[in-house]
Amino acid sequence: MPPSAASEGGVAELRAAEVASYTRKAVDERPDLTIVGDAVYDAKAFRDEHPGGAHFVSLFGGRDATEAFMEYHRRAWPKARMSKFFVGSLDASEKPTQADSAYLRLCAEVNALLPKGSGGFAPPSYWLKAAALVVAAVSIEGYMLLRGKTLLLSVFLGLVFAWIGLNIQHDANHGALSRHSVINYCLGYAQDWIGGNMVLWLQEHVVMHHLHTNDVDADPDQKAHGVLRLKPTDGWMPWHALQQLYILPGEAMYAFKLLFLDALELLAWRWEGEKISPLARALFAPAVACKLGFWARFVALPLWLQPTVHTALCICATVCTGSFYLAFFFFISHNFDGVGSVGPKGSLPRSATFVQRQVETSSNVGGYWLGVLNGGLNFQIEHHLFPRLHHSYYAQIAPVVRTHIEKLGFKYRHFPTVGSNLSSMLQHMGKMGTRPGAEKGGKAE
């Protein structure tokens, strides 16, 4: 981005730049501001005019939104249009985040493939799938409340919850379902219906994971708190030698963190040590209400109606099945043999382009029909490049994306089957679980 964000914004913007200069630390302490390129903008004033919803802008209060805007809008920052929200420049001592020109060229190719006038949002046929999932979830849960829980139906309900997570809340919370932000916002609460939390999900995925994929410090999904060794900067523990054996049952047990421990993160208004922007505080009360509502609806009410061990086991079966399905497909997408990691001791520097950081830390698996079942998230590369593009288009654009990526000289990994992806993940976990230096006969780090 040019040194002055005022070049297209007029004299008033230039004068503002002369009197206002912000370091990243200063912006971090001002949740009403956000950084794009080398300029600082009034996020609080802009959020209510944001077509995609005020909550997206609010979550980036006090943060750098350069790459977030780029990947969610698939175009360059409209400096002239945004000049009325300009409040100053990024301090000369700071290095601005640059837009990725190769990525913007890829966006132009992909946009040309989309149905005219669609904007990349959900096609009409998608809503039949969404309706079927909602009807299935409500019917099964209602039936078991009235007639009693069964283990088989509880497991199937867990799968339906997972499919709702993959096919409804995921696109909604990326703003990819509809051009009407209120629809995305409301359906985003499907995450709360299945036991998660929309605000924490947005912080984890939109604010952190998507911008810092497999970063050894900044990606929350690379933090296993000693349970697993996922990245080269993690310390080694003896049990890591067995992590390829316990990773799969551990994915089912993740349900209990999601169900209970995440509430502590919500109350602290943070995720993995990263504060949620105070500008998004209006989301707090609905988030707490939804968490309490889920506990009442899915845990307390069934146990009140049928206070038995069987009921408790069926509740666990649902949440563990859903947790396993979601965690399994997510984990194999970002943890496989040869996967990139970003930052110190990683295979990629943080100065690598946006495209390279997204592509070489992700992988695809399977094809069109797995995409129908899993909300397109088996096309994880395409999803990470275009998170606000509805999943129904991923299989269509994948060949063009792959050609473009390989021309750039970057690694594009697509596993033909889930089994081959799983095997690669287990191989990677085995390598990461080996005591550093042991494979060479050396001492542990």
UniProtKB/Swiss-Prot annotation:
Protein name: Acyl-lipid (7-3)-desaturase
Chain location of the short sequence motif Histidine box-1 per the record: 170-174
Source organism (scientific name): Diacronema lutheri (Unicellular marine alga)
Entry's localization field: Membrane
PANTHER family cross-referenced by the UniProt entry: FATTY ACID DESATURASE 2 (PTHR19353), FATTY ACID DESATURASE, PUTATIVE-RELATED (PTHR19353:SF75)
Domain of life: Eukaryota
GO biological process: long-chain fatty acid biosynthetic process; unsaturated fatty acid biosynthetic process
Residue ranges crossing the lipid bilayer per the database entry: 126-146, 148-168, 247-267, 283-303, 312-332
Binding site for heme: H50, H73
